[in-house]
C-alpha cells in the first residue's frame, strides 16, 4: 500500500464531505493501493455519521474509528498507529487536496527514488478564492532535492515548513511508540512537535515548488485568543534546544532566536483579541511571558535578528525587552480602535 491518508475529524459536518470527495475521487483513479483513516474525536454534530456513511460507500478504501475527545495531536497519532501505507498524508477535515495531489506525488516518488519526505506548497482557501501561502520555500526550481540542513534552517526561520499537512513522508519516519501523552495539553505547536520528530528520522528530501493542498482559512489565532499560546510553543523550543548538537547548524542560536521571538511577537499581538477585564490582568500576562527563562535569554538577540522579524512584532519585542508593558497595551488598543473605526465607515 502506497498511501495512508489520516484525517482527524471533529465537528466539521459543514466541510467533511467536500474534504473526503477531494481525496476519494483521486484514489478511485489510481492503480496504487491507498487507504483513508478517519478518526472521529467525539464529534457532537453529524460528522461521525458522515464518516460511517462514507465507510459504507467505500469499504475497501475507508476505515473509521470513533474516539472520545483526545485532542488533535493524540487523534493524529492514533491514526498513525493504524496506518499501513508506505507514505503518510495528513489532511485536516475542513481542508481540500488539489486535483493532481496524488498524481504529482506518485510521479515524484518514482522519479526521485522514494525520498523520505516530499515537501510542497499550500494554498490559503476561503471557500471561493485561494492564494499561495508560501512559494520558493527551499528553491525557485519546480522540483529540487534539498539537503537536510537547508530544511532545518527554513523550519527555524519561519512558518513555511511548520504545517504537518504540507508534506508527505514515509511511515518509518514516525517514532510510532513515542508517548505523546505528555504533550496532550499543547494547544498550539502540535505540528511543529511532530515535524521535529520527522526531521530526526528523515534523510532525503524533495521539494515541489507547487501548491497541492488547500488550507481553509477562518480559524486559529487570527480570530481567537489562546492564553496558552506561548507556553505551548515553549514545549517546541525545548525540543529544538535538545537537538542543538544533533542538528549541527553553525547558526543555530541565530535561527532559534528568530523562532522564539517571532512566536512571542504573535503571542503579544493576539492579546488584543481578548476583552481584558482591566489593564492589570493584561500586564500580568505580558509580564509572565517577559520573565520566562527562554525568552529572557533570546530577547537579548532582538537587534541581531530584527531584519527577520515582522515590523509590527519587532516594535512589541523592543518594548517588551525594556519592560514597557503600558506602551504595548496602548498600541494594541489603538490598533483595535483603528479597526473599529474603519469598519464603521
Regions found by a protein language model. Name each.
Residues 2-4, 35, 193:
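Cell-envelope/extracellular polymer assembly enzymes that use nucleotide-activated donors
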Residues 12-27:
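Short, well-formed alpha-helical segments that are part of the catalytic scaffolds
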Residues 22, 40-49, 70, 92:
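A conserved acidic beta->alpha catalytic loop
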Residues 32-42, 63-68, 93:
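Short beta-strand/loop segment that forms part of the nucleotide-sugar
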Residues 67-83, 90:
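Glycine-rich, basic loop-to-helix element that forms the pyrophosphate-binding segment
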Residues 96-201, 205, 220-227:
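Donor-binding/catalytic cores of nucleotide-activated saccharide
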Residues 210-218, 224-254, 258, 262-297:
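Catalytic core of nucleotide-sugar-dependent glycosyltransferases
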Residues 271-345:
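Membrane-interface aromatic/basic loop that binds lipid-linked glycans or pyrophosphate carriers
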Amino acid at each position: 500500500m502506497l498511501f495512508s491518508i489520516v484525517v482527524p475529524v471533529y465537528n466539521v459536518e459543514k466541510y467533511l464531505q467536500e474534504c473526503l470527495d477531494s481525496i476519494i475521487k483521486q484514489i478511485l483513479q489510481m492503480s496504487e493501493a491507498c487507504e483513508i483513516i478517519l478518526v472521529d474525536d467525539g464529534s457532537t454534530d453529524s460528522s461521525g455519521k458522515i464518516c460511517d456513511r462514507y465507510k459504507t460507500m467505500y469499504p475497501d478504501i475507508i476505515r473509521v474509528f470513533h474516539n472520545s475527545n483526545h485532542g488533535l495531536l493524540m487523534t493524529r497519532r492514533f491514526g498513525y498507529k493504524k496506518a499501513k501505507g508506505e507514505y503518510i498524508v495528513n489532511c485536516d477535515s475542513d481542508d481540500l487536496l488539489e486535483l493532481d495531489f496524488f498524481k504529482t506525488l506518485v510521479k515524484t516518488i518514482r522519479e526521485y527514488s522514494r525520498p523520505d519526505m516530499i515537501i510542497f506548497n499550500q494554498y490559503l482557501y476561503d471557500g471561493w478564492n485561494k492564494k499561495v501561502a508560501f512559494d520558493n520555500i527551499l528553491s525557485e526550481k519546480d522540483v529540487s532535492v534539498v539537503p537536510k540542513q537547508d530544511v532545518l534552517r527554513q523550519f527555524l526561520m519561519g512558518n513555511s515548513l511548520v504545517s504537518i499537512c504540507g508534506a508527505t513522508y514515509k511511515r518509518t519516519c514516525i517514532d510510532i511508540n513515542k508517548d505523546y501523552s505528555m504533550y496532550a495539553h499543547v494547544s498550539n505547536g502540535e505540528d511543529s512537535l511532530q515535524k521535529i520528530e520527522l526531521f530526526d528520522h528523515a534523510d532525503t528530501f524533495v521539494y515541489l515548488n507547487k501548491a497541492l493542498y488547500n488550507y481553509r482559512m477562518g480559524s486559529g489565532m487570527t480570530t481567537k485568543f489562546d492564553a496558552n499560546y506561548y507556553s505551548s510553543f515553549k514545549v517546541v523550543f525545548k525540543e529544538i534546544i535538545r537537538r542543538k548538537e544533533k542538528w549541527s547548524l553553525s547558526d543555530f542560536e541565530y535561527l532559534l532566536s528568530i523562532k522564539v521571538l517571532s512566536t512571542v511577537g504573535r503571542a503579544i499581538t493576539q492579546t488584543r483579541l481578548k476583552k481584558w477585564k482591566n489593564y492589570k490582568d493584561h500586564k500580568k500576562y505580558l509580564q509572565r511571558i517577559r520573565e520566562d527563562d527562554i525568552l529572557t535569554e533570546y530577547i537579548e538577540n532582538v537587534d541581531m535578528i530584527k531584519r527577520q522579524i515582522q515590523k509590527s512584532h519587532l516594535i512589541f519585542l523592543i518594548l517588551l525587552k525594556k519592560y514597557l508593558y503600558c506602551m504595548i497595551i496602548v498600541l494594541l488598543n489603538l490598533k483595535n480602535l483603528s479597526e473599529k473605526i474603519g469598519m464603521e465607515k
